[in-house]
């Protein structure tokens, strides 16, 4: 069966086509037949389209079109031109969508109906950047394939839906909870995939493991996983809470924001921009939200770049410690996403302070470009894994499982 996965974001859109057997899922993530990505630059200079198949790679700039038109042109490459992998869109049997916010109602993936679309739209007040883009992708595929092709919403918040009340209720007025103001958590598709993959690598029952998954990309979050579910996480009501990130501040004293509004006439929109787009690694270093140029600047003696990295690692260590306390112990620590998978100094810096938990790295393994591998020292009481997160495959797998229900 052919399953199309769409991951629609605010500034990019990713898509994959998988060909899966009807009888049994493969143990290892298969190579997609077709992969595509559109990036929309802030300056509006034309969308960058990249297509990859087993036999071809294709890149071009799309000029003059709307986002919906760009998306349609991306999907056309599935069944036309040199990147064609199917004869007709009717070969697609199911579509899976990443939907960022499912609120309290959606604790697992669900088939998309008019009611589900209305709920995604209504929840856009909590995710104003992402949920509208997710909904636009759903409607674009419905227009292309027709309403008879099942579409599945896989929610980023669902993995955290079993948080205990002590973890998700904020210590403000209780009435906030009635307004939907609570911790939701994000990156759930990635956290769940990495937890399940860790159990597979370790040859252990996931239900018996205490895990901390560290999703470190431009956005960063931790999850404490016990019994196969998230019981604590660092992101909150929005993806702004928690760890220091690429351009997001993570948690800061709310009194700072009150001070800036009173004493410096900061508007809500200005604070929103600063906290989400001009803070984190970029804000402290003044260089970039990407660690690679920061490492280069540190080597050249740049003190602000060094400070940015020091804060990043300090807050990562503190977050891991907090998650370990929520778990009451730790069996494995997992690093994933762009920074987690590729930045050996970050992994080393985090683990250096975790000896009291029994964490010990093997430096050679850590520096050896590990992928889906254990990089802990032989005598480490806690396993340390680097796992390549595969959210698209996780979504395709959810679609396959829906057909079996």
UniProtKB/Swiss-Prot annotation:
Mg(2+). Can also accept Mn(2+). The active site is at residue 156. The keyword Disulfide bond does not apply. Substrate binds at residue 98. Gene3D superfamilies: 3.30.420.40. This is Acetate kinase. The record marks 187, 248 as: Transition state stabilizer. Belongs to the acetokinase family. GO terms for biological process: acetate metabolic process; acetyl-CoA biosynthetic process. One of its GO terms (molecular function) is ATP binding. Its cofactor is Mg(2+); Mn(2+). Homodimer. GO terms for cellular component: cytoplasm. Pfam families: Acetate_kinase. It is found in: Cytoplasm. ATP binds at residues 14, 215-219, 290-292, 338-342.
